[in-house]
A protein has these predicted regions:
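ATP-dependent helicase/translocase motor core
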Residues: 1-155
């Protein structure tokens, strides 16, 4: 699934974060007390998200908490555009859930495929291009829109 979405999958012992725009590193060791992420996702050599993989048939209930713990456990020597990491996946290979912490009200949603590295890069760059200091997504930008005045009342 990751390879089909454009990710290069590597083991932690042979990781080369510059091998491609999107690199998924297996069994990535996090800070003490945070365990190992099944996959840590890097875009342009910067950590952006985590994946917790479960066996087919296992429930994903409660796994979102595990990925949230992983998202705050990135060792400081690894660059990340945002901490805690904003993109969290839980997957059995059949069922996949995704939480985008750039959303103003983040929550896990079922998705049918992993996002491509370019999609993450676009989301992280969107507001930087617009001159806003905080990355965001459409829902956040829509909430920041000014109130429209009703010009009909002034005719």
């Amino acid at each position: 699934m990751l390879v089909a979405a454009g990710w290069v999958v590597q083991s932690r012992d042979e990781a080369n974060l510059h091998a491609a725009r999107g690199v998924a590193v297996r069994e990535f060791k996090l800070l003490p007390g945070h365990g190992f992420a099944d996959y840590l996702l890097f875009v342009d050599a910067k950590a952006v998200g985590v994946i917790e993989a479960k066996k087919e048939g296992e429930t994903l209930a409660g796994v979102e908490i595990q990925t949230e713990q992983y998202s705050v456990g990135l060792p400081p020597k690894f660059p990340a555009p945002i901490r805690p990491l904003p993109f969290l996946f839980q997957s059995t290979g059949i069922e996949t859930w995704f939480t985008n912490r750039l959303d103003p009200e983040p929550r896990a949603r079922q998705v049918f495929h992993f996002l491509r590295p370019d999609s993450f890069a676009d989301q992280l760059a969107t507001d930087a291009v617009l001159g806003d200091s905080a990355p965001g997504i459409l829902r956040r930008r829509l909430r920041a829109m000014p109130t429209l005045t009703d010009r009909r009342a002034h005719v």
